[in-house]
């Protein structure tokens, strides 16, 4: 995934109403998942929640796991592990990119 794709997916621009339409979840469910620390929307100065496309995907995953009977505490643990793995992958990719840049600069 390119940096532009990542920033596009993670940009928090959608209101809870749009997220509700995209996911089929109620506003109450979305707020509940936030309260259970499964989701972390940004807030505007006036307190309006803003969500990203990544948040929508995360909500769909949460809803699927809930439907499978998984407890929110277990989902939180799973999501934390996924988030950590994603961060580690990003760091690794940045390190590799830095090594490639350094290698090609030496060749010039």
UniProtKB/Swiss-Prot annotation:
Q: Spell out the activity regulation.
A: Under conditions of nitrogen excess, the DNA-binding activity is inhibited by the formation of a stable complex with feedback-inhibited GlnA.
Record carries keyword Repressor: yes
- All copies of domain HTH merR-type, residue ranges: 13-81
A Gene Ontology biological process in which this protein takes part is: cellular response to nitrogen levels
The molecular function terms in GO held by this entry are: DNA binding; DNA-binding transcription factor activity
Something else known: The amino acid sequences of the N-terminal DNA binding domains of TnrA and GlnR are highly similar, and both proteins bind to DNA sequences with a common consensus sequence. In contrast, the C-terminal signal transduction domains of TnrA and GlnR have no homology.
Query: What is the protein name for this chain?
Result: HTH-type transcriptional regulator TnrA
Give the originating organism.
Priestia megaterium (strain WSH-002)
From the UniProt record, report the name of the gene that encodes this protein: tnrA
């Amino acid at each position: 995934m390119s940096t532009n794709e990542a920033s596009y997916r993670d940009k928090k621009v959608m209101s809870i109403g749009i997220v509700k339409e995209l996911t089929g979840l109620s506003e109450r469910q979305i707020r509940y998942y936030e309260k259970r620390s499964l989701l972390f929307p940004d807030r505007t100065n006036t307190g309006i929640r803003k969500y990203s496309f990544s948040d929508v995907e995360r909500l769909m995953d949460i809803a699927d796991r809930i439907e499978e009977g998984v407890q929110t505490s277990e989902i939180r643990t799973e999501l934390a592990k996924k988030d950590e793995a994603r961060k580690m992958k990003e760091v690794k990719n940045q390190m590799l990119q830095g090594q490639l840049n350094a290698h090609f600069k030496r060749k010039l």
